[in-house]
Amino acid sequence: MNKTDLINAVAEQADLTKKEAGSAVDAVFESIQNSLAKGEKVQLIGFGNFEVRERAARKGRNPQTGKEIDIPASKVPAFKAGKALKDAVK
């Protein structure tokens, strides 16, 4: 399922126009993104948690030259599925 499919599903299930559903989906994504950018955790009970995790600095290797390089520490978004979502997928 891609974003267009998601918008169509939301429009059908919530009895909205595709434009309204698109605005709702965009608002949800933007809210999650803004919260993560502030370092906040987003908890959606039954669905899962979005959070920012620290990735440690590490050594890597350039695949073209084989030369070792330093990869700096970074922050990455992460998602952990909730129990209801895990059970639905089983």
UniProtKB/Swiss-Prot annotation:
* Keyword DNA-binding part of the UniProt annotation: yes
Task: Output one GO BP term.
Answer: chromosome condensation
Instruction: Spell out the Pfam families in the cross-references.
Output: Bac_DNA_binding (PF00216)
Under the heading InterPro entries, the entry gives: Hist_DNA-bd (IPR000119), Histone-like_DNA-bd_CS (IPR020816), IHF-like_DNA-bd_dom_sf (IPR010992)
Keyword field: DNA condensation, DNA-binding
- GO molecular-function term, one example from the UniProt record: DNA binding
- Gene Ontology terms, cellular component aspect? cytosol
**Record flagged with keyword Nucleotide-binding:** no
Q: What does this protein do?
A: Histone-like DNA-binding protein which is capable of wrapping DNA to stabilize it, and thus to prevent its denaturation under extreme environmental conditions.
User: What's the subunit arrangement here?
Assistant: Homodimer.
> Which family would the database say this protein is a member of?
Belongs to the bacterial histone-like protein family.
Q: What is this protein called?
A: DNA-binding protein HU
Q: Which species does the entry assign this protein to?
A: Staphylococcus aureus (strain Mu50 / ATCC 700699)
The encoding gene: hup
